[in-house]
Each structure stands twice: as C-alpha cells, then as structure tokens.
Amino acid sequence: MTTFSEKEKIQLLADIVELQTENNNEIDVCNYLKDLFDKYDIKSEILKVNEHRANIVAEIGNGSPILALSGHMDVVDAGNQDNWTYPPFQLTEKAGKLYGRGTTDMKGGLMALVITLIELKEQNQLPQGTIRLLATAGEEKEQEGAKLLADKGYLDDVDGLIIAEPTGSGIYYAHKGSMSCKVTATGKAVHSSVPFIGDNAIDTLLEFYNQFKEKYSELKKHDTKHELDVAPMFKSLIGKEISEEDANYASGLTAVCSIINGGKQFNSVPDEASLEFNVRPVPEYDNDFIESFFQNIINDVDSNKLSLDIPSNHRPVTSDKNSKLITTIKDVASSYVEQDEIFVSALVGATDASSFLGDNKDNVDLAIFGPGNPLMAHQIDEYIEKDMYLKYIDIFKEASIQYLKEK
C-alpha cells in the first residue's frame, strides 16, 4: 500500500532536481518540502544557516525510540552544462535511468526519505516512537547545516541515524574524517636578480614538505591496526578482493597534498607560498593528532615563517557494525537486493555524521545507506536507476518500522 504512485514519486524527485542548489540556495528546497509536509499535516520547521541556506526538520510519532533520517539538499557544481547530454537541472528519464544533477548525490536519497516519512504517517504504520527527518544544507563543503542541527540538540535523543548517501548495496557503519590543512610560508620579495637580499618562501615550504613526506612515510609503516575496515567497500567497487597490504593502507590514515601555490611572476622572489592537504583521519590517528603532527614539523622547520590553517575539520565516526539498525537494514534489503551483493563496511569518505555525532560517545546506531551508485556522484550526466530509487523507498519504510518495533 502506497500513498504516492510511481509517477508521483518520480515527479517529486523531478521537482527538487529543478531547484538549483549548487553549494547554495537550499532554502528553495526547504520551502518546497515545508509545503509538502503541510499538505500531509506533518509538523516541520525551517532553520536558517543564512539568508539562502537552511535546514528543514520534520517529525512524525512521539516518544522513544527515535530514528533520525537524514539527507543533504546541496549539490556540487554542474560545470559546463554544454557537456551534459541532458539538462542537469531537469529530470530526464531514459532507459530506466533518471538523469540530473543530484539524482544520485543525493536528492534521490533525500526524496526517498521524505516519501518514507509521509507514507508511514498517512498509512498509520509507525508501531511506536518517533521518526525525525533532518534535511541539511552545506554538506558538500563545511557541513554548516549539520553543525547547526547538532548545536541545537536535534541529535541528542536519537537512538539510530540513517544517512541516505548513495551507497548502492553497501551499508556503512563508520567512516573516516576529513581535514583541510593549509600550510603557508612567508618570505621577503625582491627582484630575482638579487635573491640573496630576499627570502624565498618556496624554499621554506619545500623544506616543510620534505620533512612532511619523510615523517608521514615513517608513520605509515606503523599504521597497521585499524578499527575501521574498508576492504568490503573496495571489493564491491573494483569487483575483487584487494591485497592485505592495500587493505591496510586504505583502512588507515591518508594524507594527500592536493593544491600548491607560490609566486606571481618569474622575475620576482616570492614572499608567500602555500600547500594544501586533504587528510583522512581515523580513530588511531584522529584530528587532534593530525594538527599536532603538522604543527610539530612547522616548529622543526621555522615557526616564524610557517603557519597552519585548518578550514575544514571533520572527525571520523564509528558505531557498532552489528547494531540493530545495521542488521535490520541488511535483513530488509535482502528482499530487494541479491543477498551476495549486500555488504557491511566502513567508508573512506566523510558525511554529515561527523558533525551530527562527533566521536559518538552515546553509541548511536549509524547506517549510511541509500539509493544510487556512489561512482556516479559528481559526474557529468549523473543519474540514478529508477528501480533502485523506488525500491529504496520500500526498504526505508520496512526498515524503519522494524527498527522502531524491536528497538
């Protein structure tokens, strides 16, 4: 029994794909969802991050246990729209696929949760407890929306949390963190014909980088025991088992220097240069450790000429891989997905769970699970399989009922 027809479910997704939320303007989706919830007498509230960015929270039921369902409303930039086969901000159905920016990451998952909430309420299927939907702004960059909801206490009383990021047949119980670490070197600019009276910032930065590589390489030699196991994820993505050595490396700390800047013209000694790193912290080497690791190298080289800035700082999140939420989703999904395709793993990427749960001292059940092939995220001609989108609505409904009934 459903409240919405298949055609209506696809149209609801089409409606929010048309709302252009490229790293901004989530307020438009909030207003759309508020009207939709009002139509079905579901209480909801819009919480603004700023004028154009906002979250919306909606809730059905009452009392405990409390299951939170979450998805983000922002999408990444569509890039040059001329490179798309179909318009990115218009849902196009072709050969069983629904094309459009955000269909996979993650308006498909978000709308599946919205429909889940409405249909459970309309069909009076909630056995006990509360379902709280949290639609967030700004996940793709700084997680501003999730931070706001956490600060306001919307996660303080939850027993379980489903984040409907595109995971295909994967169910994730934990993930690494993500840090942006920028190291800036300062010097003295002079004409390049007299470099000896200046101070080349690039030289100082290179000294830092050489020390960083040496110490990071030494650290990785001892990074062999991990709480997070990402091997099942990689087996699914590449279609075969990865070596124990690769699994060890992938499950541990990773740090990549991804941006370098220095100098403005060839005949001047640069007075500033910078390196930016993306670091993926793990429980064994957490965010505090990473900050100290960078700062210690800066102190060794020259703290008067080098500085550290951390504009993005998301912690790794862990939960019980055998929690009631994980086992419930796995059992329900097995009726819709081939049993041998379903796997439970830790995730190398970060989600709003970092801001929602932090180090998860309260042991909230966490499941990152949603429709869409994760490899389609951020791609030109992004799409979600229509059947997957529709099936996952049913999975979310059944799993929510079972979890609240048995928790």
Curated annotation (Swiss-Prot):
> Per the record, what are the reactions this protein catalyses?
N-succinyl-(2S,6S)-2,6-diaminopimelate + H2O = (2S,6S)-2,6-diaminopimelate + succinate
Question: Binding residues for Zn(2+) 2, per the UniProt record?
Answer: 105, 140, 378
List the keywords (alphabetical). Amino-acid biosynthesis, Cobalt, Diaminopimelate biosynthesis, Hydrolase, Lysine biosynthesis, Metal-binding, Zinc
The residues annotated as the active site are 74, 139
The coenzyme or cofactor needed here is: Zn(2+); Co(2+)
InterPro entries linked to this entry? ArgE/DapE (IPR010182), ArgE/DapE_CS (IPR001261), Bact_exopeptidase_dim_dom (IPR036264), Peptidase_M20 (IPR002933), Peptidase_M20_dimer (IPR011650), Peptidase_M20A (IPR050072)
Q: Name one GO molecular function term.
A: succinyl-diaminopimelate desuccinylase activity
Which pathway is it part of? Amino-acid biosynthesis; L-lysine biosynthesis via DAP pathway; LL-2,6-diaminopimelate from (S)-tetrahydrodipicolinate (succinylase route): step 3/3
Q: What's the EC number here?
A: 3.5.1.18
| Positions with a binding annotation for Zn(2+) 1 | 72, 105, 165
What GO terms in the biological process aspect are recorded for it?
diaminopimelate biosynthetic process; lysine biosynthetic process via diaminopimelate
Cofactor stoichiometry and binding?
A: Binds 2 Zn(2+) or Co(2+) ions per subunit.
Report the sequence similarity comment from the record.
Answer: Belongs to the peptidase M20A family.
Protein name per the record: Probable succinyl-diaminopimelate desuccinylase
Specify the species.
Staphylococcus aureus (strain N315)
